[in-house]
Amino acid sequence: MAQVIKRKPTSPGRRFVVSIVDKELHKGTSYGPLTQNKNRINGRNNAGRITMRHKGGGHKRRYRIIDFKRNKDDITARVERLEYDPNRSANIALILYADGKRHYIIAPRGLSVGDMIVSGNSVAIQVGNVMPLSNIPLGSIVHCIELRPMKGAQIARSAGTSAQLIAKRGTYVTLRLRSGEVRKVLTDCRATIGEVSRSEHSLRKLGKAGATRWHGVRPTVRGVVMNSVDHPHGGGEGKTSGGRHPVSPWGTPTKGYKTRSNKRTDKLILRHRNKG
């Protein structure tokens, strides 16, 4: 079980640090055959121009290849170890299948070294097992949910997230997500029993600007302190408030303005997520 530790103020950079310490995690390096180089583009396109702001720098990482499909049916796997993954907020687990293959998966909460898990159409309802939504009882908590059958998990993959199965009707099941959104998903889509590990992630505090830079996040500059050539809120004599409703650097309204434009799947969303 992870511990939330508030660090002692031995220096200005440590004064506000809150760390998440999990002694069950593997102390060594990652499993080499399931890692690859992670080429960073730092938010630039092929012309070298910034297309995503606030990205760049940070510590070098190796990408862990995660098995989001879990399609080795009816072959039991043993959890060899739990690991930290710098590319995501959740922990990952290295599992060894009975046929000798090893895979990385998103580690659910409560999964321990030595546990046996399996995927298939009719497997036991226990943490870490994968099965179609049609075979999961109502009220169950699930994560790593597919949006299309056998495409791989797309919903509820980050630390502490999950969804609850609240209804079944025809070829669709209804899920309630942590965000408050209620949506329909095909019954043939698969999901993993339980919730994602490391729910304490939201309590973490990096404590200083430099730690944010270690994660590859660059500073966010307010529009009102820019020049008028750089932002609609820029310019003016002295300190100004922008003089208009909040917009992005390209003039799109922000702070509540809806930009979702996917009418094809709107019919599957029964209740939109809560406002932040």
UniProtKB/Swiss-Prot annotation:
Give the highest taxon in the source lineage: Bacteria
Q: Name one GO molecular function term.
A: structural constituent of ribosome
Q: Which InterPro entries match?
A: NA-bd_OB-fold, Rib_uL2_dom2, Ribosomal_uL2, Ribosomal_uL2_bac/org-type, Ribosomal_uL2_C, Ribosomal_uL2_dom3, Ribosomal_uL2_RNA-bd_dom, Translation_prot_SH3-like_sf
**Gene that codes for this?**
rplB
Q: What is the lineage of its organism?
A: Bacteria, Pseudomonadati, Pseudomonadota, Gammaproteobacteria, Candidatus Pseudothioglobaceae
Establish whether keyword Ribonucleoprotein is in the entry: yes
BP GO terms, sorted: cytoplasmic translation
One Gene Ontology cellular component: large ribosomal subunit
Keywords attached to this Swiss-Prot or TrEMBL record, sorted alphabetically, are: Ribonucleoprotein, Ribosomal protein, RNA-binding, rRNA-binding
**Is Transmembrane there in the keyword field?**
no
Q: Which residue spans adopt a coiled-coil conformation according to this UniProt entry?
A: none
For this protein, the record's SMART domains field holds: Ribosomal_L2, Ribosomal_L2_C
Main function: One of the primary rRNA binding proteins. Required for association of the 30S and 50S subunits to form the 70S ribosome, for tRNA binding and peptide bond formation. It has been suggested to have peptidyltransferase activity; this is somewhat controversial. Makes several contacts with the 16S rRNA in the 70S ribosome.
The family database entries (NCBIfam families) matched by this protein are listed as: rplB_bact
The UniProt transmembrane annotation reads none
This chain's protein is named Large ribosomal subunit protein uL2
**What organism is the protein native to?**
Vesicomyosocius okutanii subsp. Calyptogena okutanii (strain HA)
